[in-house]
Design a protein with these regions (language model features):
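N-terminal nicking endonuclease/strand-transfer module with a His-rich metal-binding environment
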Residues: 1-152
């Protein structure tokens, strides 16, 4: 039987996404003790997968390659910044800039495996043409209940 869940997809903040996902020492220092939302006992259970077609690139390099490809194919620079424009009625609306790399936060159960999420990624690719570049399972993120860590 299928289980209902949700995913929130938004433009990827390339400058901080990989540091957060890989739990770099600099990232861990910068989040500070007061803002800590990680359960240290569960860090060892984190898992990740990098799409072999993605190669050895980091996200910034991949983004720069996309920018070059857009310039080569269209002759124009990729429109990265949000801008405002007026409609025919004079109303001002915001037009989002290009965000070719997006990230999604998927709610999972504690027993969800990396293979389960990879199958979900394959389904997204078949249905909507979204290709997962990286998958990170953060089993160390959570909240505190009664003084004891509880994973989300």
């Amino acid at each position: 039987m299928a289980v209902k869940s949700s995913i929130h997809i938004k433009p990827c903040n390339i400058s901080s996404s990989e540091a957060h996902n890989l739990r770099t020492p600099e990232y861990m220092r910068n989040i500070g003790e007061a803002k800590i939302y990680l359960v240290p006992q569960l860090v060892a259970y984190n898992e990740h997968w990098i799409n072999p077609r993605f190669g050895d690139y980091d996200l910034q390099t991949h983004y720069d390659n996309i920018k070059q490809m857009v310039k080569a194919k269209t002759g124009r620079a990729m429109q990265e910044k949000e801008r405002e424009r007026k409609t025919k009625s004079g109303k001002i609306i915001k037009v989002a800039g290009c965000s070719p790399i997006r990230e999604g936060v998927l709610l999972i159960k504690p027993d969800t495996t990396l293979d389960d999420v990879r199958r979900f990624g394959e389904e997204c690719q078949q249905r909507w043409g979204i290709t997962p570049l990286q998958i990170f399972l953060h089993k160390d993120e959570g909240h505190w209940l009664g003084g004891e860590p509880a994973p989300d």
